[in-house]
Amino acid sequence: MPTNWKDSGLRWYWVVVLVFLADQLSKQWVLSNFDLYESIQLLPVFNFTYVRNYGAAFSFLSDAGGWQRWLFTFVAVGFSVLLSVWLRQQPSKMWRLNLAYTLVIGGALGNLIDRLQHGYVVDFLDFYWNTSHFPAFNIADSAICVGAGLIILDSFVAGKDDKKSDGIKE
């Protein structure tokens, strides 16, 4: 474990701040400029559409009656704390894992603020093909998905990267 935070993954916490600010500023812009369900087409397959998500990804548990708000709040806080502890234990040079953890934390905190402030998450990125729409999402959701993808990728390539840096042939 690194002896000070500058040598640890906490050095990457600027990504958390960047994701959080981009997410919150974009949602504030949507709330200030759109009515609920208002939509503006930007591309033939992409709209800005203001929707409220009372559940999790893909509106999971959105009609559960309200208790899910507190479950998702607890999960967001728990994962953010856990990943922050892991960041402190990681060397700063482990860029892929540090980037992944900070993307997930930034996204989790962005959606957490929405849940606490509004009781729902503001979603507005609406991709579709013909009449089939992918569930709307936001910058926080994107960061969480990219972070999760990097964690999965790291699980496949981390051992190979270690062997390369140690000069070991497979």
Swiss-Prot record:
It catalyses: Release of signal peptides from bacterial membrane prolipoproteins. Hydrolyzes -Xaa-Yaa-Zaa-|-(S,diacylglyceryl)Cys-, in which Xaa is hydrophobic (preferably Leu), and Yaa (Ala or Ser) and Zaa (Gly or Ala) have small, neutral side chains. It is found in: Cell inner membrane. GO terms for biological process: proteolysis. InterPro entries: Peptidase_A8 (IPR001872). It holds the Pfam family Peptidase_A8. Its EC number is 3.4.23.36. The active site is at D123, D141. One of its GO terms (molecular function) is aspartic-type endopeptidase activity. Belongs to the peptidase A8 family. This is Lipoprotein signal peptidase. It comes from Shewanella pealeana (strain ATCC 700345 / ANG-SQ1).
